[in-house]
Design a protein with these regions (language model features):
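Extracytoplasmic/secreted envelope proteins and their assembly/folding machinery
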Residues: 12, 32-35, 39, 50-54, ...
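Short loop->beta-strand "edge-of-pocket" segments that line small-molecule binding or catalytic clefts
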Residues: 1-8
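Ligand-binding clefts/hinges and TM-proximal coupling segments of bilobed small-molecule sensing domains
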Residues: 10-25, 65-71, 95-117
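Short helices/loops that flank or line small-molecule/ion binding pockets
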Residues: 17-20, 32-47, 51, 59
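Periplasmic-binding protein-like
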Residues: 50, 54-96, 114-117
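Short beta-strand-to-loop elements that line the ligand-binding cleft
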Residues: 5, 23-30
């Protein structure tokens, strides 16, 4: 099997960590190119972010015959600031407000994401 991955991505690291041989890994410019490799038949599978996979595959997309398969890793993202920044408290207040009023959940629902605690 061959796996298309975005060069330098977490997906590439995941397949390397799984022990997939370098000869089976096709590194491409971006995640959209990884999907194109599968659609073109030049790769058996691709490893991309689940958000991208959900948005770009399945019914109503250019890749209607493709679907997300398995999850290899979990990635979480955060917001970072310089140590001691007064912006941290302001952003924390805003995030707490958005969580309480349902704004964050609405965004998560809109983009088929799971809201982290």
């Amino acid at each position: 099997l061959t796996f298309a991955v975005e060069n330098g991505s977490a997906g590439q690291s995941a397949v390397v960590d799984l022990g997939i041989a370098e000869s089976q890994i096709i590194a491409v410019q971006d995640q959209a190119a990884a999907l194109m490799e599968v659609a073109a038949g030049t790769s058996d599978a691709c490893v991309i972010d689940i958000t991208m996979a959900n948005a770009m595959t399945g019914e109503g997309t250019s890749y209607a015959d493709l679907a997300p398969g398995i999850s290899l890793t979990s990635e979480e993202y955060g917001i970072g600031f310089r140590k001691g920044s007064d912006v941290t408290a302001k952003v924390n207040e805003l995030m707490a407000k958005w969580k309480a009023d349902g704004t964050l959940q609405a965004l998560a629902d809109k983009y088929s994401l799971t809201l982290a605690e």
